[in-house]
């Protein structure tokens, strides 16, 4: 396949295919924040594989480690047997990530996807409590398998199940309720009122920033209140850090600024370093209660991802990457504020934090149109929210100033063009 | 990590870890049917990553293709955007696999695991029929996420869900009923009797050989009857070929000898060629009814697996591999029959077909003890069945005579030792 | 309303009305085995309110007791407060029924219907075991509320729920499996096989004779095997004696001949004596674990039914009624055998036992046509089975020879007419 | 049983018994608003069988009609066959209740309890919409069978199910949310936000005044908003008028002042006139879609209740009863306001409307203690709310001034005594 031709996809791939519709070209090569299609056209990547490519494409150090590993016939696939590559990953994760943060968790390899991690945490929280209900939050997004989909708020996605999704209750996320600044009182009321119909949950599952749900960022105070609510009622706290974790918000775990200690932490996406499938579930030792093999899966031992994932952890040995993200986050924030001010016709609201920010607009199709215009001009960027009402800046966290400015510049141009041309109609 | 030391796993990994307990060593390198641990000890692999390594470890052609791809900074991770590597995989699958078999299916990339494929098929079958119940079979095994676990028969695994698993009904697999040769009459009776309590199912989900469930092989006649039952009642047929597919039974799809046409086919494990996470769901075009993005997932676009998976398909351009499997299957069969005859104290029954055969024994711990002894003597082999009552020969389908005989010889020694030493007690 | 006119029903009552369609007349008075409509036409009642009128209509002793009670302004409605009428009922039930049979049960008043009794037993069995699954049997019928409907086999009724019915599994009733004489081996296999997908049940719920399900009568041996299966596995046994109990099969409890001791017994229908709404749940003392008020209901204290129900228990102070039923059952049996022999074109099979016998015929509409013809000739009789394939003789158990013969004679005439006229076609 | 002795209840009745614990005496006779126990002690009844005795005990007209009916051997039990008594009930209900209110409903007889009516409406709403989710409200109470319990908010009761209750979502009732005057905005937000996780419901089920849930009275405006929400989204509206209906709030249907037109109305409790088990479901003709027999039940045809229920409808031929209730409601309101003012230590809040009013107090056990003291002084009154935090005045709606004042006077005395003696501690 040497031609930039989508016909093989159009003809043979299922209708469910999605991103290829928004980015209709055949990509071939990628490095850092850049992608090239088969025509050689270069794209700036403000999408980062929906958070799976936080370190950019084909990081050179990871690449070299992986090439050596493959060259030497290192074990590729190992289920949950012990391998040198896996041992080194565990060791690095323990010593670079957990210990310096005074975190004490058992590491579970639940299968290679974020949904696997979510499913394992849900199962374990139910098992250790003997309760079946799990509280999730409005606009939460946790995956497409039935267990994970049951705690996902998006109705279009839920509808794909073809059957009722049960054993879950949705409560309002931070700022979902319009009349108050937070939803804590409402949540406590539902939990404690003996007539609320909310069966005592095994766990809460929560994201610190809802990446798919529209870049809703919970405040640290809200997160601490949620933790307190759980602690006081013996409810387990599952922190789904699949999209917001691994540095995207400026710290390795997105919940570090809030200072909370979840009982379960779900990690995936960028944990493998280069976008290779890998997920882990961190489990507080007292809840590490699955019997051997009670949860399993074929691809728990993806050694390529162990190799690149281990190399990636080196980014966290000092605070340079953290600082880079935090500094550039401010640049993104000020850029977005500026756009909102310059284009009041967008009726834009800035959303999110760190390297997961964007603008929500009530204008019909605006976010989609801007993302589409960006693509034409060589910038990959996606939308988020139940109605795709947010455009979402997700650059690699390793991006340099040049890359960031190049992307922002294209985005600015797209905003200007779309707002100028469109007959803007609020939804 | 240069020492063969399990302490990092024992200390930091979750108790749910399983295979590392049966094979307590740190593996490092692997090639074809061989594995080496950090002490340099060589093992023959009759396990094949539970079916994910049908082509053996680090096949040289795949390895070279992959090295080149990585060297050239080919796209690693792409969600469901179009990439050259993905396009070539689709093209090869279409032209090498589907077209020559006169099969007309849309290819869905549901996420990288077999469970993802199963979940996508279950969701779609329910969606297109508007029915919620799905019939699965005794000892069926389809995965650990809630949707897939709901159709899995193993009670120990089901118990891990921590909640009731619903919208499924289990019916007896071929030869599960003792008094009759097949279960077809029973199934028809339950479906058609207006008082059986079996709500009309959206689909049947079935394996041709139950790999995890104890190497139960359905007859072609039974499979055709199941297809007929479905057709006559407008019930969709989901064929889970995750473990038995990709050549393990001697044909690419395990259901080819039966001549049936499932509505959905689940493939994973060896579809990526070298054990890299990849899964596809084949969907009859008339049921390709997910809206764009209605089912999604981060790791649908694992390009390393596309590269190696495409290369692997070359094995199917002629019939050499098929013939190799079919011939060596006969050797395995006669070896197992021989063992059963020589060691009547095992009360062994040969199970399975092709390169997924083994011996079921009612003797307490016998299968486990034999597998343990094999490991000591340098052969990796696992057990199967709800009570681990079967030891299971799963050599790579590319194995040569020397490898096969070496493995069988170790197995023979293990059987002889265990049966000689043990105080055999039937369960 | 003095005219025999159905227009008020046709115009204002819901389409769900059913018996009025088969017996299209307006009834007014009734005594013993006789009913009269507004035209004064007399009918013999071989229907007995589907088992709620085992003692016939308006038994004179009950009537007098009730008239006095009402005349004296006895408490009519009392929830679960103590009343004289309730105390006397409990006392009589204890002394006339339980003690002489060496039965030790707590009496629960779960609401006035059989479904209330079933729901209370299901809830309690789940609560005391901490398990959610309940095993029911093919063609079992337990009621229309969601809990009771979940354990009912009839698909037409289940479909009325408008949602999936969960937490139940159906296993084959005695003689449902065609190839064997009983289903015990199959049931044990499903329970004990670790891969059967049958989650360990809280309870089995079973009828001794399936009145709605087609007059399937379980053998005493089968019932004892079911009890043994439950005992050996710590599964609770719920005996639904709503239709077969209170003397219909010749003993007060239908399970007396089998000699089993259920953990929960559901009674309703004729327990109130004259067809007034009343139900009780007998609970083995060790499982009497509902907290006060954890299950409740407005009509638990129907004192009219306590009064008539207490009077009805006097029938059980000696064995005259039992003997009457047992003797007349033989007459019914021989009559039905004779009909089957004389009319082989019915392809009839005799079903049931005691005063719940009938003939199953595979001939399209035969049972319905015979019941319809009986109605024309002055006999009320209904059909049963998922396809209404059985006509069902349900005379009052207090019927005398004259009444029985009169009914049988009408039935014989109907059979002769229908078999003579019809173009009989097997389904 | 001639002695006022509870031993038969204590010894033989299940522990689940409840009211007998609060009112520990054996009642025997009753008339109007009076009850007598076996010692001849007289009690004023401010309980009215939890709403089943709205017309008081043994109303003389109903009694005479019933005596005549029984004397003449009228049909007692008739399933859903046509009887004279049933026809007259339908006719009266149509002509006295529905027609004058311009209401067009089919009448369904779903079984004799409120829960039967609720279950039938839930099933039918799901069936006609093809959706499974039903929205209920905080502190709603609809019954103890699994379908009805699933829409009941009380956690203690829900826990009795022993299994997860699914296919329902709870939303905040009027004034449940503290920060705003009504919950309408919140509800609309949950329904319309594509990410709220609230699957589109088949129906809302709502009470106008939550009798068991703590006498929460929805405003007419709130009810109209709920109706509007349903209409605009094609959601069915089920009005559970089991407790608040049949005159308890001053109009026959409690929703008359709000002017709404529910799709389904559930009636029971006092619909039978004298506390005999009877329930009806009113179904908008376009949703009368059960097939004949798709929902059934043994005690749908309780003719005694038809006779007394028909007689009771005569109370609604003119507006005297309505006026009586409305006038005396004002007396109750002013009495309660006065008590709250005189006894600020109760921290009382008046709740409810019409003849279902009471006082909520946060003081630990206050409501229970007052009800207990009332009983000692000869007044029957119960508590309500998830924590029994409300005492609840439920006199017969036919009560005269003397009876009302006598009851209020006892209540006043009890309040004075309890507040004087108690060491009042807020919960």
From Swiss-Prot, chains A, B, C, D:
Pathway the protein contributes to: Amine and polyamine biosynthesis; ectoine biosynthesis; L-ectoine from L-aspartate 4-semialdehyde: step 1/3
Alphabetical keyword list: Aminotransferase, Pyridoxal phosphate, Transferase
Catalytic activity, EC: 2.6.1.76
GO biological process, one term: ectoine biosynthetic process
Pfam family, one: Aminotran_3
InterPro entries on file: Aminotrans_3, Aminotrans_3_PPA_site, Dat, Ectoine_EctB, PyrdxlP-dep_Trfase, PyrdxlP-dep_Trfase_major, PyrdxlP-dep_Trfase_small
NCBIfam families: dat, ectoine_ectB, PRK09264.1
Protein name (record): Diaminobutyrate--2-oxoglutarate transaminase
Organism: Marinococcus halophilus
UniProt lineage: Bacteria, Bacillati, Bacillota, Bacilli, Bacillales
Protein encoded by which gene: ectB
């Amino acid at each position: 396949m040497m031609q930039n031709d989508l016909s093989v996809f159009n003809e043979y791939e299922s209708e469910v295919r999605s991103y290829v519709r928004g980015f209709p070209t055949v990509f071939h090569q990628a490095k850092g924040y850049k992608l090239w299609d088969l025509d050689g056209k270069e794209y700036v990547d403000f999408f980062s594989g929906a958070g799976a490519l936080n370190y950019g494409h084909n990081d050179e150090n990871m690449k070299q480690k992986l090439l050596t590993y493959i060259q030497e016939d290192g074990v590729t696939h190992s289920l949950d047997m012990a391998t040198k590559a896996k041992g080194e990953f565990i060791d690095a994760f323990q010593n670079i990530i957990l210990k310096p943060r005074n975190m004490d968790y058992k590491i579970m390899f639940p299968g290679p996807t974020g949904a696997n991690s979510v499913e394992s945490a849900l199962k374990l929280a139910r098992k250790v409590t003997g309760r079946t209900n799990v509280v999730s939050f409005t606009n939460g997004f946790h995956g497409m398998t039935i267990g994970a989909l049951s705690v996902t708020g998006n109705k279009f996605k839920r509808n794909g199940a073809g059957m009722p999704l049960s054993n879950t209750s949705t409560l309002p996320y931070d700022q979902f309720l319009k009349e108050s600044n937070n939803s804590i009182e409402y949540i406590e009321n539902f939990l404690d009122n003996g007539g609320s119909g909310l069966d005592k949950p095994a766990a809460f599952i929560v994201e610190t920033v809802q990446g798919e749900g529209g870049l809703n960022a919970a405040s640290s105070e809200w997160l601490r209140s949620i933790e307190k609510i759980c602690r006081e009622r013996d409810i387990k706290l599952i922190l789904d850090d699949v999209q917001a974790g691994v540095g995207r918000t400026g710290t390795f775990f997105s919940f570090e600024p809030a200072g909370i200690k979840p009982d379960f932490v779900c990690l995936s996406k960028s944990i493998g370093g280069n976008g290779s499938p890998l997920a882990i579930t961190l489990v507080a030792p007292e809840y590490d209660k699955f019997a051997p093999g009670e949860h399993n899966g074929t691809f728990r031992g993806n050694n390529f991802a162990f190799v690149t994932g281990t190399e990636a952890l080196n980014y966290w040995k000092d605070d340079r990457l953290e600082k880079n993200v935090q500094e550039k986050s401010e640049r993104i924030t000020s850029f977005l504020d500026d756009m909102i001010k310059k284009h009041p016709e967008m009726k834009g609201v800035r959303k999110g934090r760190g390297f997961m920010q964007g603008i929500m607009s009530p204008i019909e199709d605006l976010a989609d149109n801007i993302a589409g215009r960006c693509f034409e001009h060589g910038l990959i960027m996606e939308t988020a929210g139940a109605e795709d009402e947010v455009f979402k800046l997700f650059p690699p966290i390793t991006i340099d100033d040049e890359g960031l400015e190049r992307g922002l510049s294209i985005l600015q141009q797209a905003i200007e063009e779309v707002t100028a041309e469109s007959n803007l109609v609020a939804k």
